[in-house]
Amino acid sequence: MRDFIQHLQDRGILENFSSGLDNVSTPVSAYLGFDPTAPSLHIGHWIGICFLRRMAHFGLTPVALVGSATGMIGDPSGKSIERTLLEESQVAYNSQKLSECLAYYLPGVQIVNNIDWLKETTVIDFLRDVGKHFRLGVMLGKDTVKQRVQSEEGISYTEFSYMLLQSYDFAYLFENYGVCLQCGGSDQWGNITSGIDYIRRHGLGQAYGLTYPLLTNSQGKKIGKTESGTIWLDPKLTSPYELYQYFLRLPDQEVPKVARTLTLLSNEEIFDLDQKFLLDPVAVKKFVAETLVTSIHGEDGLREAQVVTQSIHPGKVSSVSEKDFQDLVAMGQAVSLEGTQALGKRWIDLFVALGVCSSKGEARRLIEQKGLYVNSEPIENEHSVFEETQVCFDQYVLLAQGKKKKLVLRLI
């Protein structure tokens, strides 16, 4: 354990750990939980996935827990208001999708689900066997609970009970799977230490906890959230291109932290990047973005991201091959129209009809700002029409709104 902890400290991604953990010399099994609040993992979960991979690299036995049972309750940690409770069928669906995702990213890692042991537990048994080991004074003193109790929103008994369920999970894994270490983000420290105390009070043995810092920007907001929503790992929800662009647009000062937290580059490679970053932050940012997209979506995902990126830059359409257009169509970045329905029509009307712009007013404003593109060339004015000379490879036209919205118009 000492080498693992030293690695995390050197990398700057260790927040807290239990006293004595660094002296444990016997093989350690450790777990990290994922609640199924959505049908996909998001970029914040990638921290946990990388953490589990690091554990395996240093000889620990990682276990991933899907929290179907706890997902029915909702973790109050880091939340200022209560989560909306999900239907049981939705939790079951989300759990299945998360299990598939974890199995893909963590081949060989054991995946367990707490519904398997909590579904048979009665309320009476839970209160007698688990509840009696917890003291309200201690629970109310936990930061997450304290903040919610003092807030206008308050905290429901449902959320208040989450700590007990997570503690029971830890004890169950300790007793049945030999798991003595629970890991998680820094906002989980209170829940983790409650589990350690419960295991001790129950006379099961010595357990430990370890947390890593949450990935936040300079304003303290979690990285992975945008104005348009969450950055998902599922390519159907967040395309490789969108993921790539998200990291390319990160403020320069966030890049070293992202490289340390979200990549599996060695510490030596990270330290080397730090030096290169001082000389050329843009090049390092591009490298980190490419590394992350490849790790999450593979080489094909990176190529997809690069193809779309190349195709939407002004003046670059001449370098887009017919195969690139075909790839864009295959990626779902296309709409088909009969040539007679499109040729000769005003572009301002087509951009609205195709959903690239929400209204003609928006389209006019963007045209004035040189923000609407046909084949990477800005539309000159609102009277510009679709001409046959703009068709590439007899059937394709590349449309874009700025650098974000892009669409291939395919003539049939």
Swiss-Prot record:
Segments forming domain S4 RNA-binding: 345-412
This protein's GO CC annotations: cytosol
Sequence motif 'HIGH' region, residues: 36-45
GO BP term (any one): tyrosyl-tRNA aminoacylation
Keyword tags: Aminoacyl-tRNA synthetase, ATP-binding, Cytoplasm, Ligase, Nucleotide-binding, Protein biosynthesis, RNA-binding
E.C. designation(s): 6.1.1.1
Coiled-coil stretches noted in the UniProt entry, renumbered to this chain: none
Catalytic activity, as annotated: tRNA(Tyr) + L-tyrosine + ATP = L-tyrosyl-tRNA(Tyr) + AMP + diphosphate + H(+)
Binding sites annotated in the UniProt record for ATP: K225
Compartments reported by the entry: Cytoplasm
Superkingdom of source: Bacteria
Gene Ontology MF terms in the entry: ATP binding; RNA binding; tyrosine-tRNA ligase activity
Family: Belongs to the class-I aminoacyl-tRNA synthetase family. TyrS type 1 subfamily.
Quaternary data: Homodimer.
Protein name, UniProt field: Tyrosine--tRNA ligase
